[in-house]
Amino acid sequence: MSLHAVSESNIKQIPDMDYYFISGGLPSNYGGLTKSLLLRSKLFGEECNQNTFFLTFRFDLELSSKIDELYSNGKIDKKFTSVINLFDDFLSVRTNGKRSYEERIGLDQIKKQVGMGKFAKTLLRLFGKKNNEMSVVYYGDGETIRYVDYWNDKNQLIKREEYTKNGNLVLVTHYDVQLNKMYLQEYINDQNQVYLDKLYVWNNEEKDVQLSHIIWYSLEGEIKVKDESELRQYWIEYLQKQNDKPKLFLVDSRPQDKHVFKVKKSPSSYYGAIIHNKHYGSNKYQIKGRYKEVFSQMYNLDAVFFITEEQLEDFKLISGEQETFFFTPHTIDKPLDPAVLNVPSEKYKAVIISRLASMKNLIHAVKAFSLVVKEIPEAKLDIFGSGEDFEKIKKEIEDTKLQNNVFLKGYTDNPDSEFQKAWLTISTSHFEGFGLSNMEALSNGCPVVTYDYDYGARSLVTDGANGYVIEQYNIEKLGQAIISLMKDESTHQKFSEQAFKMAEKYSRPNYIENWAFALNQMIEVRIEREKFSKKVGKKDPSISSYTEDFDKTKIEIDIENFDHNDIKKIRLVGLDRKNKAEIISTNLQNDQLFVIDLEKDVNIEKIAANKTQVIDFYIVFNANGHIKTMRRLSSEETKLSGNSIDTNNGYRVEPYTTVKGNFSWRVTEIKES
């Protein structure tokens, strides 16, 4: 799976679809995931003339101003990309409203009473009424009202009104004065209508309120749901039914998977997930919590897109081979200019441009630099960025007495210039989805000294060619590599030239070509799967004979009714019921017999890593070109022994027939007495 050759004809092959790129919201200080989504939206529009939608779910007071900023800064093109939101563009629009919010007081009237100020100001009497007070809090500009709190004469909060930066009232929260907790939230649209209510009840165990239910006053009448997830699914369903134009719903943010993939897919819709971050826990078989949904929906998805080949291969370790896996690496959000190689670099200067987050592990960069300074006292490290680890990093700088060598510089709006001036950059992350900062460095001819983490380190950095790849968490070797490169001008020159060449592989034309290839394959695979599925037929294969022989289970199936002309291979697979991890895979031994060797064919590591409790069995029929279709294995016409089988690996399996008549195993760990 390599980057594909570019041709003018291929560049124009992005399928004509509506593309929905889905994230929970639009953060104020967004990272690599949102940058990737925005750039994809921009390039699909500008380079391929395709409409894209950046779809967000979360209610956000500042969303409108954030969107304006994206357009004004050229992050997305208004001609092609729309940022749409569940509340702003669906719930508040398709409504008849519960009532008009008549209690509203004009902002100008409020400002006249309280005057202007940056912080909360209190009006002791509201329009002559002696039983109410109010306080006002402004946005950072000190002029625009963010919210207004209303208090009774006992100084108890009774209501809060929240406003956007444009002065629109959008949310009113009502408080129980006895509990000092909210009991009702009313959402207000541009027509001053209450279009949605959230109702809260007291939870004795949690000693706090919890959401009871939501009522949306839709055009079709009141719709009562238990949580926002149902509203999100309702919106996805609505978007699918708007027209028959093909649509790709591509989820970037893993917490959103459950809101999208559980919605029944219309014939014109495609579901996809793009993987931005490490999916495994303590070992490569253990699925991280936020990735469980994408694995459990694996056979419902039309595509899973990967930005590194290494992660694509690691996904296969869990799920087995999938014809829906595609490699679509990142690109650089600028034209590449070889003139960057002529910009003088400061010999003993390193730079890091990163979020100051724990997963970036920047403490190790500071520790390694303390070793560098012992060898090269004039060495400098500039760290640009902000985040929750600022104080920890600052303390490490002070503890290692590097205040004259390592500097926390805050945000930079010109990372290219910083990379061009630096001799090298350092990357010490625990893990990455790709390492966009490293790619930006390479595009400016800046060599990278990086830990060997998953994922992206070796995708971008070839050890000894355009930087150094260091054993992860080996601070001493990291420091030695930095020292070596700072002292060696000849190696630095070579690394710098090769850094730029590596960046060229991630050019815009190659980016579009990889997406064009993947998306057209996605469509072709679904067409071929549907054709092949019809040829195989709807009937589920059934067990005709089931025997257990020490460490082997022999299963004979009745496959006489299947068209063997189009079937090239038949396998028996056992999938973890919860996450669809492929636990067992064995080939047909003759016309009807499968044999499961408990020692060889059962992946105990996957069972242990994910605490597998039930394995469901399927027959997988393969056509040419890895196209496959699956059928659940039936056991309702066969009497199973009912005996449990103990493996030599500490597990007990118990075969049984499900309520639907299908064949499964219960799996339990054998506890030592």
Swiss-Prot record:
Keyword terms, alphabetized: Cell wall biogenesis/degradation, Cytoplasm, Glycosyltransferase, Phosphoprotein, Teichoic acid biosynthesis, Transferase
InterPro entries in alphabetical order: Glyco_trans_1, Glyco_trans_A_1
CDD domains tied to this protein: GT4_GtfA-like
Biochemical pathway: Cell wall biogenesis; poly(glycerol phosphate) teichoic acid biosynthesis
Reactions accelerated catalytically: 4-O-{[(2R)-1-glycerylphospho](n)-(2R)-1-glycerylphospho}-N-acetyl-beta-D-mannosaminyl-(1->4)-N-acetyl-alpha-D-glucosaminyl undecaprenyl diphosphate + n UDP-alpha-D-glucose = 4-O-{[(2R)-2-alpha-D-glucosyl-1-glycerylphospho](n)-(2R)-1-glycerylphospho}-N-acetyl-beta-D-mannosaminyl-(1->4)-N-acetyl-alpha-D-glucosaminyl undecaprenyl diphosphate + n UDP + n H(+)
Induction remarks: Positively regulated by WalR. Mainly expressed during exponential growth and rapidly shut off as cells enter the stationary phase.
Family listed: Belongs to the glycosyltransferase group 1 family. Glycosyltransferase 4 subfamily.
Stated name of the protein: Poly(glycerol-phosphate) alpha-glucosyltransferase
Originating species: Bacillus subtilis (strain 168)
UniProt gene name: tagE
